[in-house]
């Protein structure tokens, strides 16, 4: 739902207020009829004292609460009456105060124009210093008053909405009170409380009605106060600067006098040493003069930075007040845009830290030299002894005078250096405060502007005002055009333009040579002996250089147009540099996908895919150019983004083109390109979905009025696209380098094998006992393993780099999310060490919780693949261990993610543990078997008596363990059927694990031979059959035994061992077949029970054998 915000005319506002007030008064008739006199505070306090003497009970507590509430309401009435009287007084004196403020403003403007420092020059330095201190105090008072005036002015901007809300709330409250007063059963004390409450509401209604009625007058009054204080602040700052300049000039004059005095003394001296000392004093005086000038410069910088700091502090207060008063309105958006433009930039003075360190060292050294001059006799004696000179009394006196002057000059120098040090430290701290406050203001403005509507929603009203808005924008664009008025720099600019054309032409002249070099590289990469890892980087560099000529020509033409046809060429020049950079990138990018370009020759893609990508990129360039130049339209009007209807139309058209034309083509290209690379399918899916949904979402934002938000996101998406393109190019270049290295390694190994084979052939032709043939050495690592390990290592850094790049691109919007902390969803009490506090759960907490749940879901779904790539593929683990680790980590991630998400929403473990305890007890009785199976599953995962892949037998069911779940274990029996067995059966029942600690099992083959057979031969044949089977272990070795005399057989057993359970069936089959073959070859009969059937004739006694005739 879109709510239109508009300013209600004062007439209708006052009419609405009068109606609300009349309604509230009419509904208060019952209260007026009940009594005409309200109780006094003294009478209520007396009643309260009498009530406290009553016996304890509910009636006493209720009566005390009613009386105390009545007393509080009376006090609120008194406070409200004072507020009403103050408002009335302000209104009655508003006209005179406005005239007075305007007159004072005119006087201050005249004072500002005619300000002079002549009078200050005649004052002493102490007097000027005291005046400066007083002015600084006055400046602080003016800043505080200005803050108050600004708060009043900002609050007046939203007085209509706040007064209407208060009147509406009072009407509802009045209706509720009147309904209570209509009930005759309420007590007299409660009735008096309601009557007092009605009186308070009446005063509040009167106050709000007065505010609405005199809204314009109060706005004029507060604006005049603000203008006066603001101008007064400027005058005071100007006076401070003027006085500080006079102080600096006096300091400078004093230093100059000392220099002149030293120079005068030099003219009358004949002694060489004294002349040298005079020269040193003159140099010291000159140095003192330089340091005084530096101190004066630092003073001006410190004063300027302090004024900026005060201005920023005032701006911060103003922004906070405006945000509080105009939350969610279009007016706030326009104010934010204005404040952004007013923020200072590039104000910091560089090198202050080094200057402070140098000053401290310098002060220390000069102080040491000055301390030597306190004992002049000792200093002169030292000079006489070192230089071998003897001063006369007059010369000694003159030297003392010089040293005394030097000591004074040194003290002045130290004072100046200390002043510089203090100013530099103060300036550095001020700069730090300016940076912090500026960053805070910038962050707050970014937060507000991102989440606040910047334009009117696109609806029917927007369509109606579209023609007029378009005309205004086109007129604004025409105002930007014009011929230059100053041609002083024209010769230099022409030389600059000519230089760009010449460089571009030189590159264009070598175009054929560059193409020949590229063709040469393309031919070399198809041969193993000429291919190199540097072939692709060199080809990329040549391609970028080849596309540079058109970029330079484009830049030259754009800057010429900006100079000759725009009133402010600098704005157009900034745009031309930016567009030239994009031009170079996209011409380079599109040249990679030529039929014989790098994408085909170096990255081994098909020409059809290259052509498809080229077509998509050409269309993307159109969209990017349209979106990048949207800001041009917003700069031609005074309102900026607020009235940028042309930019809105342009942006929506570009996004529609992206969603309707580019997205389907891009998806088709990705589907055709996907078979060429079998990695990162999930990333391709995300890109495909994003290309469809992002333009639609941005269009919705623009339609709803969040035009600035959409432009901000568009800019970040474009930068992300460019960053991804560069990353993709680097990634494929590195991959190709690894491929080239792998091919060379394979070639070297093949050559080594051939050489080794040739040596072996030579050895075979040499018959000598001294020659020992050495077999081929085993390869340490397969080529595929080398390449896969390199790719995994590179992927780790490449994907980390991509995440870092994306964070850099989107980092400025991270602070925007903190705005969600101000949107409270619910509140709850929390007990801490400091006591019970109220904790607010905001929309930011909900967003963080959703992110945690999403990350947890992604980890749980992909933990098996991640562990396989990072750990399991590099470490040899026993059977079932990877499954156990994966399952346990899944449970851990779910528990941590769930607990973290709940804690983010204010539901900590201390609050949930009792719920979980109660649920555990309740569910433990109701779902005992399920809990038993759950605990049994945890035991099985930790003790690991069975593992995935083990062959087990339980309850006469045999099969292979396929899954170990929370409740049950899935077995795959030998008929390929899934058997679900509860976990509890494996813990409490008897289980046979055929491969728990050792997969070796024994096979027993029973054979019965006929009586009379050669038993030794039978034993040999059984062992021979066992030895011939490769799956039978030699340790323990096979054994054959003659066990029993059967009814018709001599029973033997062949006992062998196999390494794996899966070899049992195949080994049994092979042994039985081989034993049958060997016994048949050696005429050994396998005895069996034989039944002969005879048909007997009872009459004749003849017996006829029954023979089965096979047909």
Swiss-Prot record:
Gene3D superfamilies: 1.10.287.1260, 2.30.30.60, 3.30.70.100
One MF annotation (Gene Ontology) recorded for this entry: mechanosensitive monoatomic ion channel activity
Subcellular localization, as worded in the UniProt entry: Cell membrane
Single Gene Ontology BP annotation: intracellular water homeostasis
Its membrane topology: Multi-pass membrane protein
Signal peptide: 1-31
UniProt entry keywords in alphabetical sequence: Cell membrane, Membrane, Signal, Transmembrane, Transmembrane helix
Transmembrane segments: 490-510, 538-558, 572-592, 620-640, 644-664, 694-714, 797-817, 840-860, 885-905, 922-942, 1003-1023
Protein name: Uncharacterized MscS family protein HI_0195.1
PROSITE patterns the UniProt entry points to: UPF0003
